[in-house]
Amino acid sequence: MEQIPFVSSAPNTLGIELELQLINPRSFDLAAAADELLAQMANHPIADRVKPEITRSMIELNSSVHEHPMGLLAEMREMRDALCDAADAVGVSVAGGGAHPFMRWQERAISDSPRFQYLAEMYGYLARQFTVFGQHIHLGVPSGDAAVRMVRGLSPYVPHFIALSASSPYYEGVDTLFSCCRLNAVSSFPLAGHLPADVTDWYRFEAHIAQLRACGLAESIKDLYWDIRPKPEFGTVEIRVCDTPLTVERACQLAAFAQALAVLVTREPEPAPAAWLAYRSNHFQACRFGLQGSYVTPDGQRLRLIDHLRALFQRLMPIADELGTGDMLVALRDESIRNGNDARWLRSQFHRLRDLPLVVESMTHAWRGERETAGAAAEVPRRRIRATSEPVHGVQALATPEAGVTPGWRPDRLH
């Protein structure tokens, strides 16, 4: 059996990746402008931190390694501003959010790299449907065994990350009824899911990878689209379930939450085997209902996810104070519990604007840090922002000759 070397990292270090939307500033549809944007940034100091993604309407922004989330936030703000300047120069805008509200997957162009071209050939339309946008959080760990223990310890909290970050309620012009529809695209791939319950240390992880290779099911760890997975070449555990938030501030708050939670799980016993029993149900509840979903704890108690999250924040606050991140966790807690997640904000924007292209425009403003635009959500009564299966209006911008759509087109009913 081939051994997989694990590069040791300092505990509690962290970094993030953000997959971002490139937006046409006139139609507010996606723009296949990644090549032009990357060329514009080729000589910029952060050029090596901006990467192409599977389709040409996406780019990925990678942080460096940090010990404290405030340092991460300072770097992300600098990179955001540099990215926006370059985007302005090539005539596009940038937005966060887990899915574009009205893009058509058929119009997406695959990026020109051997791996992306292979994925398109292998997975067909799924590769173009994979034009969705996530935040990955990396947490430093000292060894492979520590990485496996961390993955197992964090797994019961996957629903919390999903619900806190959810920002993909709309897809192809329809309110999906989900807070996070992005993960439905991820789950279509055959090696999506989670670490097998019987993988309890690095040796067993290596054995599992060897078995997948022997069966021709995977060539490398990159083929594992798990919710949380080890990243041995970085020396990290990678949390992969978060939608890309609408702002870098929320992205860094989530990183601070992950850092404190990682400390907590190293101090507590490993979750009971029953933790895996409700894994898929908890995952669905968080995607579908966000913070209002139900949650089954590892010991079998059923309660609202938001109530479990409140109790979790109480347990995390002493750790956050040790790490010097209390302010960031308080901000995440208060904003999420009082105003809801980004999915609710997007629905409140549509409630106010009645036009999906204008919602996308508000997403681009939020990404730039124009908080006066993003703050309007709190003014809309919660009871008036319920999800609906009715088709979304205000997508006339799609009905253009360029898009190949008949004028007057409306999205089909969801059901």
Swiss-Prot record:
It comes from the Bacteria. Its EC number is 6.3.2.2. One of its GO terms (biological process) is modified amino acid biosynthetic process. The keyword Acetylation does not apply. The keyword ATP-binding applies. Keywords: ATP-binding, Ligase, Nucleotide-binding. InterPro entries: GCL_type2/YbdK_subfam, GCS2, Gln_synth/guanido_kin_cat_dom, YbdK. GO terms for molecular function: ATP binding; glutamate-cysteine ligase activity. It catalyses: L-cysteine + L-glutamate + ATP = gamma-L-glutamyl-L-cysteine + ADP + phosphate + H(+). It holds the Pfam family GCS2. ATP-dependent carboxylate-amine ligase which exhibits weak glutamate--cysteine ligase activity. Belongs to the glutamate--cysteine ligase type 2 family. YbdK subfamily. This is Putative glutamate--cysteine ligase 2. It comes from Bordetella petrii (strain ATCC BAA-461 / DSM 12804 / CCUG 43448).
